Amino acid sequence: MSDNKVEVDKRRTFAIISHPDAGKTTITEKVLLFGNALQKAGTVKGKKSGQHAKSDWMEMEKDRGISITTSVMQFPYGGALVNLLDTPGHEDFSEDTYRTLTAVDSCLMVIDSAKGVEDRTIKLMEVTRLRDTPIVTFMNKLDRDIRDPIELMDEVEDVLNIACAPITWPIGSGKEFKGVYHILRDEVVLYQSGMGHTIQERRVIEGIDNPELDKAIGSYAADLRDEMELVRGASNEFDHQAFLKGELTPVFFGTALGNFGVDHILDGIVEWAPKPLPRESDARMIMPDEEKFTGFVFKIQANMDPKHRDRVAFMRVCSGRYEQGMKMHHVRIGKDVNVSDALTFMAGDRERAEVAYPGDIIGLHNHGTIRIGDTFTQGEKFRFTGVPNFAPEMFRRIRLRDPLKQKQLLKGLVQLSEEGAVQVFRPLDTNDLIVGAVGVLQFEVVVGRLKSEYNVEAIYEGISVSTARWVYCKDERKLEEFRRKCSQNLALDGGDNLTYIAPTMVNLNLSMERYPDIEFAKTREH
């Protein structure tokens, strides 16, 4: 077995998806604790203690206690090497989140057991459906009062259209939370509160019929036996093939804050989640065990190092292996580049990568030449597909307090749009600059970063734009006519792609009827 194959088989690359405040960043902390990457998990928003969550590292994130930028963390667990991509969890950081989901092989969905399925979770699940990504589910916050577990699973099945197979089952909740029963292992793991910061030995009782269980939890033992009869009859058994197709999700219960149940999830991911998968390109399917290196960029992050105004492109390795100093072919611009200083990450702490395998994420220093979606190979000319731009849902006009800095403003906006922080549109008929985002917080981030990184003071004004669509037409003559007649609604985006800026949905629908040969697209491949 080649070194490459051994390394590929070890890798598990996943992201965590959840609604804001369901406990995603806490789980990230605890997962790293189990991977020995952190000795003491700093509870998130732990402002009093001055210990900030490891994965929230940009200034604004430190101020607000939210993870704005996707961080990457690699750690060993149970004989595997796990790559965890932390995704922005707050209301508004969705486009980055969407794109991160294109770089993973499986996802962990975290649900607040008091609330059930919430709208951001629904949106993110739609994105995972584009590639039928396998999903593992964690019902969190069992140390609080929760909804009925069977009802929670029914809701996941109905709303997200995925079958649920319980792997662990809760015994009580809130102040009466006693632990979980691991259905596949036939063992009860008992919970003790106040042990969230470190990994402690838990008491395990083997066998649901063990009299020790009655001694330990009293009448809860008999209740559990009755409940399990019902659960076994009413729920799906775990089916590995259905899981790999994205049709069924194994469900775990626990509390991330109490560091309870997190090891069960990790065991499940290592045992069941797929190793790095083949990837589609516009030429052929790329297999992870191919000899030659390939990879694609799914995110660009500015300012990872406050001492340098650098930008780092995050690349998923898809085949072959990266070695320090190797030559890569940057397909879009047709140039070869020598890469001697790629990085591996532990959220803001960076180390030089000497070698990286399929499933790993490496960072390339970017001086403005790399864009989201770029493919790198060892000479072959093809492009990985499936890293889209999503049409913004909110728009603002942006203008300067000091008109002499127009050049810096445009430079800053184009760089921020290449990085995916925001989208920028330049209308054909005016000198306006329009900024588009998927959520309000992105606008704040952009103004803050323009000031700190480009020394530009910008302000927003309202603008009557409802939505945007990228426009295409195979017939050049028809496209030119459309351009002439609709120029007041057309703009170029940060990559100079023609975009229709619609003041209302009615206007968009009328234009689509009037120009049937023009394609109005909601997403655009990079």
From Swiss-Prot:
Keyword Glycoprotein set for record: no
**Cellular component aspect of the GO annotation:** cytosol
- Gene3D superfamilies (UniProt xref): P-loop containing nucleotide triphosphate hydrolases (3.40.50.300), Peptide chain release factor 3, domain III (3.30.70.3280)
The tr-type G domain, residue ranges: 9-277
Q: SUPFAM superfamilies, from UniProt?
A: EF-G C-terminal domain-like, P-loop containing nucleoside triphosphate hydrolases, Translation proteins
Please give the Pfam families that the UniProt record associates with this protein. Answer: EF-G_D2, GTP_EFTU, RF3_C
Keywords associated with the record: Cytoplasm, GTP-binding, Nucleotide-binding, Protein biosynthesis
Q: Where in the cell is it found?
A: Cytoplasm
**Can you name one GO molecular function term for this protein?**
guanosine tetraphosphate binding
Biological process per Gene Ontology, one example term = regulation of translational termination
- InterPro entries for this protein: EF-G-like_DII, EFG_III/V, G_TR_CS, P-loop_NTPase, PrfC, RF3_C, RF3_dom_3_sf, RF3_GTP-bd
Chief subcellular site?
cytoplasm
Kindly list the positions annotated as binding GTP.
18-25, 86-90, 140-143
Bridged cysteine pairs (disulfide): none
What this protein is reported to do is described as: Increases the formation of ribosomal termination complexes and stimulates activities of RF-1 and RF-2. It binds guanine nucleotides and has strong preference for UGA stop codons. It may interact directly with the ribosome. The stimulation of RF-1 and RF-2 is significantly reduced by GTP and GDP, but not by GMP.
Task: List the PANTHER family hit by this protein, alphabetically.
Answer: PEPTIDE CHAIN RELEASE FACTOR RF3
What does the sequence similarity comment in the record state about its family? Belongs to the TRAFAC class translation factor GTPase superfamily. Classic translation factor GTPase family. PrfC subfamily.
Q: What is the protein's name according to its record?
A: Peptide chain release factor 3
Q: Gene that codes for this? A: prfC
